């Protein structure tokens, strides 16, 4: 053996250092020598120790012989070496290869402190296998580009130190970490692979992982790194696997894609530009801080539990389409996610968070999961579809901001609920056969088209929804929550009925004079309030047992034949009109509840019927030349004015109607059903005659001493009962063949010249008096039919 610290120098061509006959491994200091010299290892190991540096240009040979660099110095080998036993780096030293055969044919092995491997000639590629011993690190790189073509295996670590590029072209399997230093590049060449069991850390500014020349997709463990670093995918896909988590702040670029197949969390905090697909097979891909994905990268979550977490991002996020299976999750946090590109995507998982989703692509994004995000849903272009089993959050407002934008519910298998609906002309909501419910307290204006055979729209919120498009959905419109629905044209509510239930709602128009021809069904206990600022026409039949309220200052005109049985209320300053062909409902009581309230029948083309009439002073019923019949068994008090040239009032019901206003209608008053009419003043019955027919009725006064000067015509077979609690005067001529009955305890005084031929009956406790200028009818028999009955001619 030589001294372990003795440097060996083969100074001349032909010089030989032969350790083949040694029976033990040999150790020296450094090795130097010129080309043409030889070191013959035989099958022995030669260890180079010490701290010095050496350059050997000759040939190292030996079958089974190996070379170990155990010192911290630098050994440069430039010869064409043929030893087969391998090369070992153990002490942290540096081994520089001058040619592709500098390390013989055996493996390069690291252990202990490992060492550094570099090339003295740019572009040198070593084909040796590399075995990284557990706990050791092989540092590669330096100033010249180096290629490693052999397979790298073992549990040790690989460190890349530049500024050179180290290119891997072997199929690598090592499980230790991979660290790429500042200014250094680790590249994968043709046929090469990263190790799927190794994590990668780009630890310094300018560090680069370059996969652009790889000829197959690449897989590694977690990816970490700071700002100013780069991963260049080229056209390749990089898969991050394993159980570890990583945070990468650099930029991933290229036309390739990124796949997450590990169980940990990969966090990206850089502005990534790669345009290939982002695939999450398992684990969590998180965007945090100033990080982002490429706006054109489609995202696919392929397995239950896969998660795309945007909650830590500091800004809105954009991707291409999103696809995925049930059980996967996109967590928006409070961020907005914009889906772009021209492709189509179907996502069956849950999009969650307080953020929103924006559709800006030209394709179709179909959601088949039960999504819970509560931010806005915005469709700038393309189609957002809800598929089988899918739904949006019940509180997300939906806005279609571009012509051609489509919200397609036709494939949904359950009714859908959102917040408000907004959008521009040229956009479309396709209901198919589904119901869309708009909830919440917000307001929206939708100028596009709502279509769908059998589809319906429900306003369940308390806000205002304005529809200005020519809508074609056929399933009807429902008001249930007390909100307001504003129609911008006659087709705004499609072709189906307008239905109310629950809290009902308000119906108005944004364009004065709009007429809706939809049938209206007023559900039991609900109220439809109509009117608002602009005049509105209702041409369809209003049916049901619910109520109708008119709230101005506009005029609501009915041109349909209505049958509803709930109450009709006309508010302060409001007008309910009946137009040509229209009709009030005979089963609805009408209440003019505020000063300035008007019931206008002047344009009606047929006689009108309603229930009892009520109202306050200052309100008006304008009969025009039409007849108004009050039916039913209910009672009403009307303190306003009934006007109308030629218009008449008929009490056909069995209830009591009290009129206290100064009425001016001229067409007369008719009692036909046995009900009671109470006059509150002498002009309460207008200027026309009081006529009885059929069951006749009762005439009285609510103010004692009132005298009515209206002529009275008692129809054949009918009876007019007069009297009641208060004294009443009848100053007009009573004619006809019908009967007059006086029913007290009050006094009824006749001051007209009467000619009727029917019977006169005075009930018990009642008084019929004849006043100044008055006369009994000579053709009428008088019967004092009860005790206390009085006929008083003394006045």
Task: Describe the residue ranges of each PLM region.
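Surface-exposed loop/turn positions within long extracellular repeat scaffolds
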Residues: 1-36, 54, 61-62, 74-132, ...
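Solvent-exposed beta-strand/loop surfaces, strongest in extracytoplasmic domains of secreted
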Residues: 40-44, 50, 104, 132-133, ...
């Amino acid at each position: 053996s030589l001294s372990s610290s003795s440097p060996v120098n083969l100074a001349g061509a032909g010089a030989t250092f032969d350790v083949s006959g040694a029976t033990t491994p040999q150790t020296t200091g450094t090795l130097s020598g010129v080309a043409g010299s030889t070191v013959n290892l035989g099958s022995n190991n030669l260890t180079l120790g010490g701290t010095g540096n050496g350059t050997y240009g000759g040939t190292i040979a030996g079958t089974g012989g190996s070379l170990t660099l155990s010192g911290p110095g630098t050994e440069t080998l430039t010869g064409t070496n043929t030893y087969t036993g391998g090369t070992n780096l153990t002490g942290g030293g540096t081994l520089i290869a001058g040619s592709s055969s500098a390390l013989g044919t055996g493996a390069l092995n690291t252990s202990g402190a490992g060492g550094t491997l570099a090339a003295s000639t740019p572009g040198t590629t070593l084909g040796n296998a590399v075995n990284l011993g557990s706990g050791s690190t092989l540092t590669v790189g330096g100033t010249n580009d180096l290629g490693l073509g052999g397979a790298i295996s073992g549990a040790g670590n690989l460190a890349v130190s530049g500024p050179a590029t180290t290119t891997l072209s072997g199929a690598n399997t090592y499980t230790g970490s991979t660290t790429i230093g500042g200014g250094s590049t680790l590249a994968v060449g043709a046929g090469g692979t990263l190790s799927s069991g190794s994590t990668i850390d780009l630890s310094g500014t300018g560090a680069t992982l370059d996969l652009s020349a790889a000829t197959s997709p690449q897989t590694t463990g977690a990816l970490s790194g700071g700002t100013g670093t780069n991963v260049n995918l080229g056209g390749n896909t990089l898969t991050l696997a394993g159980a570890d988590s990583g945070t990468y702040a650099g930029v991933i670029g290229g036309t390739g894609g990124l796949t997450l197949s590990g169980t940990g969390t990969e966090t990206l905090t850089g502005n990534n530009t790669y345009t290939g697909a982002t695939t999450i097979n398992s684990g969590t891909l998180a965007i945090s801080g100033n990080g982002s994905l490429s706006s054109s990268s489609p995202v696919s979550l392929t397995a239950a539990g896969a998660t795309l977490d945007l909650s830590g991002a500091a800004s809105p996020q954009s991707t291409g389409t999103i696809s995925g299976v049930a059980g996967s999750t996109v967590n928006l946090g409070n961020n907005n996610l914009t889906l772009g590109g021209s492709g189509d995507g179907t996502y069956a998982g849950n999009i969650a968070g307080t953020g929103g989703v924006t559709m800006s692509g030209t394709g179709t994004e179909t959601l088949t999961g039960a999504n819970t995000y509560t931010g806005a849903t915005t469709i700038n272009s393309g189609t957002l579809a809800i598929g089988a089993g899918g739904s949006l959050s019940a509180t997300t407002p939906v806005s279609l901001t571009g012509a051609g934008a489509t919200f397609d519910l036709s494939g949904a298998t359950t009714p859908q609920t959102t917040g408000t609906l907004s959008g521009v002309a040229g956009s479309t909501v396709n209901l198919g056969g589904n119901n869309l419910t708009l909830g919440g307290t917000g307001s929206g204006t939708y100028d596009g088209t709502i279509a769908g055979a059998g589809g319906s729209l429900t306003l369940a919120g308390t806000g205002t929804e304005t529809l200005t498009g020519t809508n074609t959905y056929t399933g009807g419109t429902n008001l249930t929550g007390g909100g307001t629905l504003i129609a911008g044209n006659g087709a705004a509510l499609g072709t189906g009925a307008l239905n109310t239930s629950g809290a009902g709602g308000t119906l108005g128009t944004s364009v004065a004079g709009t007429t809706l021809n939809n049938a209206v069904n007023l559900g039991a206990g609900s109220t439809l309030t109509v009117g608002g600022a602009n005049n509105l026409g209702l041409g369809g039949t209003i049916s049901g047992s619910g109520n109708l309220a008119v709230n101005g200052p506009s005029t609501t005109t009915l041109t349909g034949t209505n049958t509803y049985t709930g109450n009709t209320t006309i508010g302060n300053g409001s007008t309910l009109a009946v137009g040509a062909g229209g009709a009030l409902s005979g089963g609805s009581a009408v209440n003019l509840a505020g000063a300035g309230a008007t019931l206008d029948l002047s344009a009606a083309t047929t006689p009108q019927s309603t229930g009892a009439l009520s109202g306050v002073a200052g309100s008006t019923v304008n009969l025009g030349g039409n007849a108004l019949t009050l039916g039913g068994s209910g009672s009403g008090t009307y303190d306003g004015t009934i006007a109308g040239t030629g218009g008449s009032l008929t009490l056909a019901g069995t209830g009591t109607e009290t009129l206290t206003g100064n009425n001016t209608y001229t067409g007369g008053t008719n009692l036909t059903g046995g009900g009671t009419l109470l006059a509150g003043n002498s002009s309460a019955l207008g200027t026309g005659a009081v006529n009885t027919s059929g069951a006749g009725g009762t005439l009285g006064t609510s103010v004692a001493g009132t005298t009515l000067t209206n002529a009275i015509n008692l129809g054949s077979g009918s009876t007019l009962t007069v009297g009641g609690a208060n004294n009443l005067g009848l100053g007009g001529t009573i004619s006809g063949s019908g009967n007059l009955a006086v029913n007290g305890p009050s006094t009824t005084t006749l001051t007209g010249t009467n000619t009727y031929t029917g019977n006169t009956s005075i009930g018990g406790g009642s008084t019929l008096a004849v006043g100044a200028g008055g006369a009994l009818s000579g053709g009428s028999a008088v019967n004092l039919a009860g005790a206390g009955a009085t006929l008083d001619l003394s006045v």
